[in-house]
């Protein structure tokens, strides 16, 4: 719908694409996406540049005992819902996806934006923080679409990819955020934790006061984003995929536009459910035209006996 609207639609492509599409650089992927009707594709890692700068500022300030990265929406939601005592430690910084969506809209006024990556949780994040990203697709969905249109992504000379060997392309691997940062404050311990259970254990330790001054990169997926649920290729092993990311990255940085505000609200999300009372239930039944107890049938189709 966005494409047929006639408004230019730009893609923010997650840096894990090099692990998902073997031998394919940003130039080849950009060409294929243009054949689908997109105006162009640029790297989410450009937005990660601004995120890294914010993390570096937090570390340099040294005011926070513990800093937890806020790139992974699943980790953010886990903390917001189930570990609210750890919320003060969660960095109030936009994710690379949100930052890059805003960058694209600043560079191309009036455009629509679509994020494509290996993460299902990004769909929820785009809905929760509306405005930066208009739609989210997974690599699986993109590959299916390309097949439907008989578009083959062919390796081509990737001058655009080679000319900008930015270190924020490391983001989709475990420790990738840390490797993109200048870790100049020796007061902090820098660590990367991946996998939901490991994150849960770490959060419990933080809440119990068992953790000293540190910056923690947290990812819900084992092996971080390259282990995402919507990577559509058969995994050839973490070493192969990390190597693909590492070879595409470097020690440089993106020359990107600045954003006025990189903060992100991450409030507590209550899981308490309000149960309707008898009067509310009677009102619901009345709206269903069930005014007699004999009409209150239990079909059991929901799996419960009442």
Question: Where do the model's predicted regions map?
Answer:
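Iron-sulfur-associated redox domains of electron-transfer enzymes in respiratory
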Residues: 2-305
């Amino acid at each position: 719908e966005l494409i047929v609207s006639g408004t230019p639609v730009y893609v923010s492509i997650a840096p894990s694409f090099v692990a998902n599409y073997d031998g394919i650089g940003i130039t080849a992927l950009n060409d294929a996406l243009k054949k689908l009707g997109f105006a162009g594709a640029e790297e989410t890692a450009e937005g990660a540049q601004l995120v890294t700068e914010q993390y570096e500022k937090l570390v340099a300030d040294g005011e926070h005992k513990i800093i937890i990265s806020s790139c992974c929406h699943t980790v953010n939601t886990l903390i917001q819902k189930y570990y609210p005592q750890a919320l003060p430690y969660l960095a109030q910084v936009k994710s690379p996806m949100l930052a890059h969506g805003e960058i694209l809209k600043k560079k191309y006024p009036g455009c629509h934006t679509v994020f494509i990556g290996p993460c299902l949780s990004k769909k929820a994040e785009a809905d929760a923080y509306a405005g930066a990203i208009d739609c989210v697709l997974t690599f699986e969905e993109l590959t299916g679409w390309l097949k439907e249109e008989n578009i083959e992504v062919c390796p081509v000379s990737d001058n655009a990819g080679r000319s900008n060997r930015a270190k924020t392309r490391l983001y989709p691997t475990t420790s990738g955020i840390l490797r993109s940062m200048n870790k100049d404050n020796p007061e902090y311990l820098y660590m990367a934790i991946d996998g939901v259970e490991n994150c849960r254990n770490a959060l419990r330790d933080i809440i119990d006061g068992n953790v000293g001054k540190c910056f923690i990169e947290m990812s819900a997926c084992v092996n971080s984003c390259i282990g995402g649920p919507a990577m559509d290729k058969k995994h050839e092993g973490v070493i192969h995929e990390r190597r693909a990311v590492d070879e595409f990255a470097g020690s440089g940085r993106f020359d990107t536009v600045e954003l006025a505000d990189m903060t992100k609200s991450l409030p507590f999300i209550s899981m308490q459910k309000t149960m309707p009372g008898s009067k509310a239930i009677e009102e619901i039944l009345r709206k269903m035209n069930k005014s007699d107890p004999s009409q209150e049938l239990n079909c059991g189709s929901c799996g419960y006996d009442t």
